[in-house]
Each structure stands twice: as structure tokens, then as C-alpha cells.
Amino acid sequence: MGLYAAPTYLANAGMPLHPKNLEAAPHHIVGFLGSSTGRVLSCVLHRGDEQVRVMGRYAIATDDGNAYLAAGVAGLGALWLPQYMAAPHLARGELAPLFEDWSIAPMPLYIAFPPNRHMGARLRVFMDWMVELMKTHAPLSGAVPHRR
């Protein structure tokens, strides 16, 4: 996971020097709404013994991943993403990394299905594909995919 912002956002708001700077004007954050609470998820960054929870001024908040990413790329505010999602936008110059000496805990990914049903071949193939896909990106995020 990393914290990113569009170059247009940084040109307008300036480069924040510390994560807490994102909580004050002129900075904004693109908020992501948690599915279980409907509240904006906070971002917790770590550097050595220092831990900072960022709850900033939200330009927009959404529960849709595509809208979340589009808002960040459009320059509406800073956002946190898994590195594999940010990588193509970094390569195209649409996003720039912030606070590279800080870390954010990886975001868990779950596959949910009814436990009382037989696991069909399609579901098994999908689950195997997801595990392999995440293994490819695990070195980027520090996550270790596993299977039950």
C-alpha cells in the first residue's frame, strides 16, 4: 500500500511534508467508504516507532473503487492504493508517490461464498487464479496470499 496524489493536485495544493499535513488546508483526501460501516476509512501510516492516523478533509468519498481511483487521478485529493493498482498510473505520470519512507499495512482481500454449497469448478479456478495473481504482486505490498 502507498499514498499517492496526481501531479495536478500537488501543483495546486503543494507537496505535503508530513502525513498530518493532509488534514489541513489546502490539502484534501479522496475518501473510501467502508462497506460494513458506511464511514470513511482512515489511513494509518508507520515510520519506525511513529504511527499517524490520517483523517483529512475529504474532497469526495465513495464506496466504488473505480470512482475512488478516478477521483485521485483527476486531482481531487490524495489517496492510498495497493502498489499494483498505482503502478500503471505512476508509469504514465498520472500519480506521484507521497511519503515513501512511511508504510501502510496491506489491505486484506477476501473471496466470500456460501459455506454450505459444493465448491464448483469455476469457483475453484477463480480462487486459484486470484491466489496466483496476488502472489505476483505480493512482493510489491508485503502481503502473503494464502488459501484455506
Please give the residue ranges for each predicted region.
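Hydrophobic hinge/microswitch elements
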Residues: 51-97, 104, 116, 127
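Small-molecule pocket liners
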Residues: 1-3, 7-8, 27, 43, ...
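Flexible hinge/capping segments at coil-to-helix
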Residues: 4-30, 48
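C-terminal effector-binding regulatory domain of bacterial HTH transcription factors
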Residues: 83-88, 92, 102-148
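Residues that scaffold the ATP/ADP-binding catalytic core of kinase and kinase-like folds
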Residues: 12-13, 32, 89, 98
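Ligand-binding cleft/hinge of the Venus flytrap
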Residues: 19, 41-55, 89
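Secondary-structure junction motif
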Residues: 28-48
